[in-house]
Amino acid sequence: MARIAGINIPPQQHAEIGLTAIFGIGRTRARKICEAAGVPVTKKVKDLTDAELERIREHIGVFAVEGDLRREVQLSIKRLIDLGTYRGMRHKRGLPVRGQRTRTNARTRKGPRRAAASLKK
């Protein structure tokens, strides 16, 4: 099993798809990494040689991926919260940040509905 950036890449998948298991690498970036490393995108991960894996690791090393990228994202969110920006407040309150409506929908960000207090006479 190939291990790149601390992640076990699924051996049955093509190189391009397997690389997307790494946080911070999508299809486009995975394809560019494979092309730069000289690895065919349709080659299975289990069929990659050690030299090919090493070239892929070198090209991935250029990008912020996994822990570094997660830390970077968390620090930028923390900075927004500390500055007291509107976006920071939305993050803090667990509401949508990018202007989506919240009167209806937004359930993913807001979480499950709370039971409404019933008024009894």
From Swiss-Prot:
Matching Pfam families: Ribosomal_S13
User: Annotated region Disordered: where?
Assistant: 92-121
Q: Which UniProt keywords apply?
A: Ribonucleoprotein, Ribosomal protein, RNA-binding, rRNA-binding, tRNA-binding
Cross-referenced InterPro entries, in alphabetical order? Rbsml_uS13_C, Ribosomal_uS13, Ribosomal_uS13-like_H2TH, Ribosomal_uS13_bac-type, Ribosomal_uS13_CS
Q: Please give the Gene3D superfamilies that the UniProt record associates with this protein.
A: 1.10.8.50, 30s ribosomal protein s13, domain 2
UniProt superkingdom: Bacteria
Q: Name one GO cellular component term.
A: small ribosomal subunit
Which residue windows are transmembrane per the record? none
Q: Per the UniProt entry, what are the Gene Ontology biological process annotations, in alphabetical order?
A: translation
Q: Which GO terms describe its molecular function?
A: rRNA binding; structural constituent of ribosome; tRNA binding
**HAMAP family in UniProt:** Ribosomal_uS13
Which NCBIfam families does UniProt cross-reference here? uS13_bact
Relate the protein's function as given in its record.
Answer: Located at the top of the head of the 30S subunit, it contacts several helices of the 16S rRNA. In the 70S ribosome it contacts the 23S rRNA (bridge B1a) and protein L5 of the 50S subunit (bridge B1b), connecting the 2 subunits; these bridges are implicated in subunit movement. Contacts the tRNAs in the A and P-sites.
Under the subunit heading, UniProt states: Part of the 30S ribosomal subunit. Forms a loose heterodimer with protein S19. Forms two bridges to the 50S subunit in the 70S ribosome.
| Family of the protein in this entry | Belongs to the universal ribosomal protein uS13 family.
| Record's protein name | Small ribosomal subunit protein uS13
Gene that produces this protein: rpsM
